[in-house]
């Protein structure tokens, strides 16, 4: 038997809007920093060729990263440096009219994956899979901050209190071995997959990474941009992933699946060993169902809960996570004998995370996310 399929059951492209928000309170002064990441088109492709009991499959997709985000008003971690400088030169008093800040930050992270694998149908109830994925990371940060003292601070009026310039590109690559199995027992379907940890180091190609205090450039010690200096390599491993799913066919037209994902985050290398601060690796629980309303139409719905095991030392303005739950809905429309169109929408609600810096300083991290997907399956 020969069969060639070009498909993506999830998406041909995705339109995504992700909003990152950081609320900061330092020295009695509150700040609100909003970053918007909008991705109007993220393509992905999958294909499979089957002959007898063997199937070879391949795909190309954006498999990770946070996309592009722009913080037009900068970040609280940089503004707090300004407030600390004002606190020092003003004798401990800080009011907004003592200084002015002009600041902005853009960041991007994309992991592109090319995957190839081979499946074998062992018997009527067992199929196995082995393959791998090549991951290529590209991203970086570009931003600036200029803070100037006002004339109501004696001696320092008009002087640059803090200056920051950052222009850094990052690249890296790594290989992910993948194993899987599929078991079919009557109306029950069990799926297992394990993705091994991917060793990934990001190398900086930096044009600027300078922090100035009172006009003097800082050295590496205590410099918040030391990790972004030219040539620095930063570990950014992709954690190993174990997934297990159990599906049941209630009716020939009605199916449901319960699924569990575990990311072994604490065993992966990350910048400044921040993974050690996590309480545990990421847990994800998913449940979904699909119903064949008619011969040409299938609808589906699902729920996902994600728990990262977060801790204060893991979170920063540049990189943070929030526990969440997602609701999704989709439909598959059979257009012809060979062509099926898939549409989907999901919305994610994130829990706010509060990080206490000191008795007078805290950051609150939050997000919102909405995604629309469109895909096609074509069987030759």
Region annotations inferred by a language model:
Residues 5-7, 39-42, 46-380:
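Outer-membrane beta-barrel porins/channels
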Residues 1-18:
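Transmembrane beta-strand segments of Gram-negative outer membrane beta-barrel proteins
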Residues 18-38:
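Surface-exposed strand-loop-strand hairpins of Gram-negative outer-membrane beta-barrel proteins
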């Amino acid at each position: 038997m020969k069969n060639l399929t070009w498909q993506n059951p999830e998406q041909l492209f995705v339109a995504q809007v992700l909003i990152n928000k950081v609320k900061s309170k330092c020295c009695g002064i509150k700040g609100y920093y909003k970053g918007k990441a909008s991705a109007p088109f993220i393509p992905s492709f999958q294909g499979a060729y089957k002959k007898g009991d063997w199937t070879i499959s391949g795909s190309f997709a954006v498999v990770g990263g946070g996309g592009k985000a722009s913080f037009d008003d900068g970040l609280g971690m940089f503004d707090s440096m300004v407030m600390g400088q004002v606190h020092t030169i003003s004798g401990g008093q800080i009011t907004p009219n003592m200084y002015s800040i002009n600041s902005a930050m853009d960041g991007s992270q994309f992991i592109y994956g090319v995957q190839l694998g081979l499946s074998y149908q062992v018997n009527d109830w067992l199929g196995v899979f082995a393959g791998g994925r090549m991951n290529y990371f590209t991203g970086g940060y570009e931003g600036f901050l200029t803070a100037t003292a006002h004339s109501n601070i004696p001696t320092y009026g008009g002087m640059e209190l803090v200056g920051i310039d950052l222009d850094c590109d990052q690249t890296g690559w790594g290989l992910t071995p993948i194993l899987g199995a599929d078991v079919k027992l009557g109306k029950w379907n069990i799926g297992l997959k394990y993705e091994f940890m991917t060793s990934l180091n990001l190398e900086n190609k930096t044009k600027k990474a300078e922090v100035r205090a009172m006009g003097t450039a800082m050295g590496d010690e205590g410099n918040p941009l030391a990790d972004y200096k030219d040539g620095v390599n930063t570990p950014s491993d992709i954690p190993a992933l174990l997934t297990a799913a159990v599906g049941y066919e209630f009716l020939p037209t009605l199916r449901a699946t319960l699924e569990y994902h575990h990311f072994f985050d604490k065993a992966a290398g990350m910048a400044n060993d921040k993974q050690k601060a996590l309480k545990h690796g990421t847990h994800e629980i998913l449940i979904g169902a699909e119903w064949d309303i008619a011969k040409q139409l299938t609808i589906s719905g699902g729920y996902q809960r994600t728990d990262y095991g977060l801790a204060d030392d893991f979170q920063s303005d540049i990189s943070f996570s929030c526990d969440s739950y997602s609701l999704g809905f989709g439909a598959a429309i059979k257009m012809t004998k060979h062509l099926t169109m898939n549409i989907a929408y999901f919305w994610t609600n994130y829990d706010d995370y509060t990080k206490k810096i000191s008795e007078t300083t805290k950051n609150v991290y939050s997000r919102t996310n909405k995604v629309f997907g469109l895909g096609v399956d074509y069987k030759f």
